[in-house]
C-alpha cells in the first residue's frame, strides 16, 4: 500500500471517529502520521490536515490534542517553508486556485474566479455559434471555427457538475481556510457568516486580526455550550451576526476586533448586552414610560398598609372589593401596589 493510500485510509478513520464522537485509537493513528515523511503534494491530495484538525477540536484526550497540534504546526511550517522546490510551489499555487487548500497564504478571491469565468464564457460561446451558422458557405473557415469551439469546450469542462470546481462547490471550499473547518457543513457556514460580519467594514484591517480565526473561536464557544446545531444554536449565531453587522452599533464590532470583548463573552451575551448605548437608553425610556402609564391607570380604592406586596415586599397598597360571584359568596379583593405597580387578587 502506497503512502498516499495509507494517508487517505487514516483520514477516513479520523473523520469517522469525529462524526461518531468516539476517538479511541486516534493516538495510534496520529503516531503513524508523525512517523510519515509528509510532502506538500500529499497534504493537498489527501486533506489529512482537515481530519487531524477535526480530532484536535473534538477530542478530550490531552495527549491526542497535543500530538494533533504538533502535527498541524509541522505541516504549516512545511507549507510556509521557503526551501520548497519551484515545481512544488507551482503545484501548491495551482492547488490553492482550484481547491482552496492553502492555509497561510489563502485568499478568497482565487476561489471565486471560476464562476466569473463561466459567466463571461457563455456569451462568447453563443457568438461563436452564430458565426459558425453564418459561415456555412465558406468551407475554409469552418475547420478553424470547429477547432476554436473544441478548445473552448475543453476550457469549460472543469465547470461541469461532476468537476470539483463547480460554482456551487468552489465557494464553499475557498471561503474558509482548511485549518478552520469543523467537518460539519452547518458549523462551517456559520463560521463563514461570522467572519463576513466581522469584515463588514474595511477598517477591520487596522486591527491586524485574523477574522476567520476569531469567527471560528466564537462559533466553537457557542457549540461547546449548546452541544448541537439545532434552532437554538442557529438563533444564537444569527443574533451575533445581526448585531456585528448593525451600522448603528459599530462599537460592538470594534470591541470584538480589538479584544475588549473576548470570543467567549460575545458567544454568551444577550441581546440587551449587545445593544448600542442609544438603543439601551431608548429601551430604558420606554420601560419607565410603561411603568408610569401602568401606575396612572389605577382606579380609586382604599389605601392600606396591612397588605404586603410579594414583589417589592412593601406595604403601600390600594385595594378594591368587588362582588364577582353570587351574593352568598365572599367578595373578591383586587390589590394594587403603589410602589412597583404589581397587581393581585384574593377572596
From Swiss-Prot:
Coiled coil: none annotated. The modification Phosphoserine is found at residues 113, 139. Residues 83-100, 119-131 have a biased composition (Basic and acidic residues). Residues 5-82 form the TFIIS N-terminal domain. Residues 132-142, 157-168 have a biased composition (Low complexity). GO terms for biological process: transcription elongation by RNA polymerase II. It is found in: Nucleus. The keyword Nuclease does not apply. SMART domains: TFS2M, TFS2N, ZnF_C2C2. Residues 83-168 are annotated as: Disordered. Residues 186-302 form the TFIIS central domain. The keyword NADP does not apply. Transmembrane segments: none annotated. One of its GO terms (molecular function) is zinc ion binding. A zinc finger (TFIIS-type) spans 305-345. One of its GO terms (cellular component) is nucleus. Liver, kidney and heart. Zn(2+) binds at residues 309, 312, 337, 340. Keywords: DNA-binding, Metal-binding, Nucleus, Phosphoprotein, Transcription, Transcription regulation, Zinc, Zinc-finger. NCBIfam families: TFSII. PANTHER family: TRANSCRIPTION ELONGATION FACTOR A PROTEIN 3, TRANSCRIPTION FACTOR S-II ZINC FINGER DOMAIN-CONTAINING PROTEIN. Belongs to the TFS-II family. Necessary for efficient RNA polymerase II transcription elongation past template-encoded arresting sites. The arresting sites in DNA have the property of trapping a certain fraction of elongating RNA polymerases that pass through, resulting in locked ternary complexes. Cleavage of the nascent transcript by S-II allows the resumption of elongation from the new 3'-terminus. This is Transcription elongation factor A protein 3. It comes from Mus musculus. The gene is Tcea3.
Amino acid at each position: 500500500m502506497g503512502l498516499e493510500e495509507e494517508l487517505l485510509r487514516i483520514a477516513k478513520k479520523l473523520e469517522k471517529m469525529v462524526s461518531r464522537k468516539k476517538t479511541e485509537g486516534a493516538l495510534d493513528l496520529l503516531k503513524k502520521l508523525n512517523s510519515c515523511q509528509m510532502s506538500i503534494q500529499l497534504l493537498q491530495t489527501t486533506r489529512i490536515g482537515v481530519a487531524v484538525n477535526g480530532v484536535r477540536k473534538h477530542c478530550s484526550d490531552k495527549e491526542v490534542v497535543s500530538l494533533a497540534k504538533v502535527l498541524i504546526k509541522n505541516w504549516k511550517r512545511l507549507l510556509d517553508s521557503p526551501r520548497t522546490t519551484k515545481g512544488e510551489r507551482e503545484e501548491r499555487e495551482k492547488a490553492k486556485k482550484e481547491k482552496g487548500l492553502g492555509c497561510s497564504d489563502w485568499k478568497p478571491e482565487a476561489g471565486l474566479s471560476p464562476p466569473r469565468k463561466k459567466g463571461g464564457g457563455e456569451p462568447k460561446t453563443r457568438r461563436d455559434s452564430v458565426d459558425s451558422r453564418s459561415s456555412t458557405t465558406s468551407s475554409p473557415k469552418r475547420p478553424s471555427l470547429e477547432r476554436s469551439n473544441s478548445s473552448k469546450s475543453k476550457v469549460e469542462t472543469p465547470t461541469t457538475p461532476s468537476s470539483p470546481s463547480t460554482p456551487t462547490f468552489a465557494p464553499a471550499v475557498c471561503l474558509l481556510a482548511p485549518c478552520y473547518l469543523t467537518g460539519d457543513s452547518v458549523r462551517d457556514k456559520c463560521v463563514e457568516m461570522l467572519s463576513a460580519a466581522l469584515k463588514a467594514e474595511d477598517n477591520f484591517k487596522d486591527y491586524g486580526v485574523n477574522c476567520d480565526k476569531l469567527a471560528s473561536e466564537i462559533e466553537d464557544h457557542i457549540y461547546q455550550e449548546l452541544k448541537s446545531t439545532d434552532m437554538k444554536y442557529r438563533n444564537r449565531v444569527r443574533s451575533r451576526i445581526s448585531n456585528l453587522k448593525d451600522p448603528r452599533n459599530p462599537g460592538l464590532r470594534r470591541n470584538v476586533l480589538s479584544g475588549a470583548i473576548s470570543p467567549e463573552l460575545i458567544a454568551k451575551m444577550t441581546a440587551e448586552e449587545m445593544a448600542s448605548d442609544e438603543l439601551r437608553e431608548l429601551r430604558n425610556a420606554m420601560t419607565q414610560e410603561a411603568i408610569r402609564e401602568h401606575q396612572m391607570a389605577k382606579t380609586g380604592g382604599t389605601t392600606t398598609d396591612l397588605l404586603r406586596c410579594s414583589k417589592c415586599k412593601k406595604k403601600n397598597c390600594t385595594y378594591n372589593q368587588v362582588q364577582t360571584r353570587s351574593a352568598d359568596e365572599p367578595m373578591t379583593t383586587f390589590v394594587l401596589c403603589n410602589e412597583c405597580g404589581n397587581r393581585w387578587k384574593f377572596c
